[in-house]
């Protein structure tokens, strides 16, 4: 656990860099429709960001989009954002990455609990990140996490989460580091072994988040029920584009996207929503990588 989903993204990339899975200057692909802190750590840590276009019917990178992007840019890593609780054919994307020797990691901050063909989003890549900010599937007020089944990455995440020291890894691994680098026992608690930050959560954030895990299934089930209601109503209106989510067998969405077919319809419905005091916002965020900044 870390202090935010944004920190989870930063920590994951730094830990992969520490392990030499990726290096400064490597090209990292990311979804053209994403949150700012899926992109920003890529830039901040010295990688080259490569936006990959999305399929408007799924709002996510499709295998076709990825293949088209690979013809122009040879990426070392794909930081795939599972947008708003959905995915395209992530199984096919995983196979492409494996074939091309591309490291696949997932930003699953908007999709906790969603399943593609019976497999949870967030379990297709080498690691995945989650956010527990207010409004997400579970909330610890502020918080996030990184998940992986790789022991070396797990240790490095714990090291880099807390300054670069060893205090949070198990004693046997800690001893092996101390022996390898010949660290004097007096200094071992204050020796920093790799690049890191202080991204630790507070005890109260951890307590609140842990408590909500006991009814996570209830939360995501209710989200799926709500999604079906919104989707049914939206599909009755010819002004909106329909989503194609046939391969999603469980949808734990973050919000419901309404996509108008024309700019005029967009302006019309924006006014209607505001008049009826219904909160609306962009699907995620503006296209930051096109900004002069």
Predicted regions and their residues:
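Conserved coil-to-alpha-helix start sites within the AMP-binding
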Residues: 33-39
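Phosphate-binding glycine-rich loop
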Residues: 1-27, 41-43, 51
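Short beta->alpha connector loops at strand-helix junctions that form conserved
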Residues: 32, 51-55
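PLP-dependent aminotransferase class I/II
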Residues: 5-6, 64, 68, 77-81, ...
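Hydrophobic/aromatic ligand-binding patch that stacks against planar heteroaromatic rings
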Residues: 41-42, 96, 204
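Active-site phosphate-binding strand-loop segment of PLP-dependent enzymes
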Residues: 57-156
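Structured binding elements
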Residues: 46
